[in-house]
Amino acid sequence: MNVSIEGQMLEVASGASCGDALKGALSGKKFKNVLACRLDGGLVDITATVPDGTTTIEPVYADSPEGLDLIRHSTAHIMACAVKRLFPAAKVTIGPSIDNGFYYDFDAERPFSPEDFEAIEREMQKIVDAATPFERSEMPRDEAVALFEGMGETYKVEIIRDLPNDTVSLYRCGEFVDLCRGPHIPHAGFAKAFKLMSVAGAYWRGDEKNPMLSRIYGTAFADAKTLKEHLHRIEEAKRRDHRKLGQQLDLFAFHEDVAPGMVFWHPKGMLVRTIIEDFLRKEHLKRRYDIVQGPQLLRRELWEKSGHYDNYRENMYFTEIDENAYGVKPMNCLAHMLIYRSAIRSYRDLPKRFFELGVVHRHEKSGVLHGLLRVRQFTQDDAHIICRPDQLEDEIIDVIALVRDLMNLFGFDYKVAVSTRPEKSIGSDEAWELATNALVKAVERAGIPYTINEGDGAFYGPKIDVRLMDCIGREWQCSTIQCDFTLPERFDLVYVGQDGERHRPVMVHRAILGSLERFIGVLIEQYAGAFPAWLAPVQARLLTVTDAQNEFVESARAALAKAGIRVEADVRNEKLGYKVREAQLEKIPYILVVGDKEVEAGGVNVRLRTGENLGLKSLDEVVSLLESDCQEPFKRGGMSYSFS
C-alpha cells in the first residue's frame, strides 16, 4: 500500500511495523530520534503494525511536544519499576505525565521523602542504561484482574474492574507490568534526562475517605542540557517567589483563617498598587475612555438574562436582601451596558469607551489558590467599547497599541493569538467574519507576529489573547480583547444611525493587565522584588554613620521629599554595614550614606542597591538624579497612542 510519510509517497508492505515503514523513509539520524508515530492521526507505538488502508504515517520526534509527553509518561513507569525494586511492598496506583513532568502515586508502608530520591534515581538510571524495552500486550479483562490480584496490586484491580472494555492493554518495562493505554517510548534509553522533584500526599481518587497515598513528582526532558535549564528556571522561580518576597518586603499578607483567597495589602504594597492604578486612569483618560463604576451587587434576574447564571453560577457568590437574590459581580460588563442604556445614543456618540478598575469576586476552589496569582477577590482593569461595526477595526488597533505600550513599559515580551469561531457558537456568519477580519487586520497593521487558534474563540465572538513572557521564560495570560454579539442583543443595546433607524452596536470586552493582583505578583517575580525606581514604594533611604549627622539628614530628607521623592531616614544607632545590608534586602533603589565628610561637603554618598557606588554628590545633584530616575512614566511623555 502507498502511504504518505513527511510528504513522500512510499510503498509499505502489508504487516510492516511503523518502525519498518519509517526506517525506509527517514535518514538514520532522524530515525534514531523517533519515539512513536501517528497513523492517520492516531498515536501508536513505533512497534505497532501499519493496518491496511493507512494513508499517512507521521513520526513523533523526541524534541516535539508530543515526544516530550511520551518521555515523561514513560519515565513515570521507569520510576515505578525502580520503586518496586527498592520497596516491594509498595502498591502502585496511577502515574500520568503532567505539565513540566510526571508523578506516580504509591500506597507504601511509610510515606516517601526526598531522602529516598537518590536511591530511586540510581535504580532508574540502571533501567535507562540497560535500554530496557517497553513491550505492549493485550489480554481479556478477567485475565488482567487475575494477573494483578496475583501481584497484590489491589488498586490496579479496582481500576480494571471499572473499565468498560472487554480487553485491556498492558506495558512491561523489565519486570514491572502496568495497566496503560500507551503509547510509550521504544526503550528506557530515551529517558536519559530526569530528576525527582518533590513528594506530597494525595487521596486515592481524590476522595478524602480513601487512603492517603504518597505521590512522587519528577520531571524529564529529551536531553541533559534542557533538563539543566529547566532546573535553573525552577531555582530562579523559588528565588523570585512573590509570596516570599511579599513577606520580606512587607507588601501584603493573607489570612486564610478569616478571608481565604483575599489579599490584605500592607502600606508599601498598597502604594505600588495605587501608583499602577493612578497610571492606568491617566493613560485611559488620555486615550479618551470614560471612567465609570458599577455596583458590587446586581439582582439575580440580570445574571439570568446575561447567561452567567446558567453558565457561571458555580464561580459566583450570591446573597439575599429583602427577599431578593443578588449576585456579587464576577465581571463588570453588565453594569457598563446599563450605563450605556441610560441615554439615547446616536451614531455620532460612538464609540463609547467605559473603563473601570472593578473589584470582582470569583469562587476558586481552595486547592488552586496561589498567592496573588490565583485569588477570589481581585481588581480588573476592565473596559467595554461599544461601537459601530465600521469602527471595530480602529478600536481594536488602539487597544493593541495600549497593550504594546504597557508591556514595553513593564519590560515584558509577549505573544499574540487570534482565536476563531468554535463549533458551538451563536451569531451570523457575516458578524463572525466581520469581527474576525477586524481582529486579524488590526494585529497585522500593528506589525505584531501572531498565531491563529482555530475554533478557540468564545461562543459569542472571536478574541485576541496576549500572553506575556517573563525573564525566566514563563508565560502568563494577560490581555484579552474579545468581540461580543450576544450581550448587545440580550440587553437591546442600540444606537440611532444616520438613517434615523435603530442599529445594533458591537461590544468589545478588553482587559490589558487583567487581574491587578496577579499582574503585581508577576511583576514582583519579574523584578525579583527590585521594582524600577518609579514604582518602588521607597525610592531612597538616608543612612547616618553616627548621631552627629541627624540634623543634616533631616534637612536632606525634607529636600528630597519636597522634590517628590519617596524617601526615608535611618538614624538608628546601628553599624553602617548593617543598615546598608538591610536597605539592599529591602530592594531600595538609592542608598544615601551621610558621615562627617558628607556633612562637611554638603552632600551624600550615593550607592545603588546592586552595590555600585556612585560616590559623593551634592544634594542638588542627588535631587536632580532622583527626580529624573524616579519620575513616573506618564509625566515623562513618550507613550504612543497608535500605530503609524
Swiss-Prot record:
Cofactor binding annotation: Binds 1 zinc ion per subunit.
Catalytic activity, reaction form: tRNA(Thr) + L-threonine + ATP = L-threonyl-tRNA(Thr) + AMP + diphosphate + H(+)
Region (Catalytic): 241-532
Disulfide bonds: none
Span of domain TGS: 1-61
BP-aspect Gene Ontology terms: threonyl-tRNA aminoacylation
Pfam families tied to this protein: HGTP_anticodon, tRNA-synt_2b, tRNA_SAD
First-tier enzyme category under EC: ligase
Chief place where the protein resides: cytoplasm
Cofactors (names): Zn(2+)
GO molecular function: ATP binding; metal ion binding; threonine-tRNA ligase activity; tRNA binding
EC number(s) given by UniProt: 6.1.1.3
CDD domains, per database record: ThrRS_anticodon, ThrRS_core
Entries under InterPro entries matching the protein: aa-tRNA-synt_IIb (IPR002314), aa-tRNA-synth_II (IPR006195), aa-tRNA-synth_II/BPL/LPL (IPR045864), Anticodon-bd (IPR004154), Anticodon-bd_dom_sf (IPR036621), TGS (IPR004095), Thr-tRNA-ligase_IIa (IPR002320), Thr/Ala-tRNA-synth_IIc_edit (IPR018163)
Keywords: Aminoacyl-tRNA synthetase, ATP-binding, Cytoplasm, Ligase, Metal-binding, Nucleotide-binding, Protein biosynthesis, RNA-binding, tRNA-binding, Zinc
Family, as annotated: Belongs to the class-II aminoacyl-tRNA synthetase family.
Record protein name field: Threonine--tRNA ligase
Species this chain originates from: Nitratidesulfovibrio vulgaris (strain ATCC 29579 / DSM 644 / CCUG 34227 / NCIMB 8303 / VKM B-1760 / Hildenborough) (Desulfovibrio vulgaris)
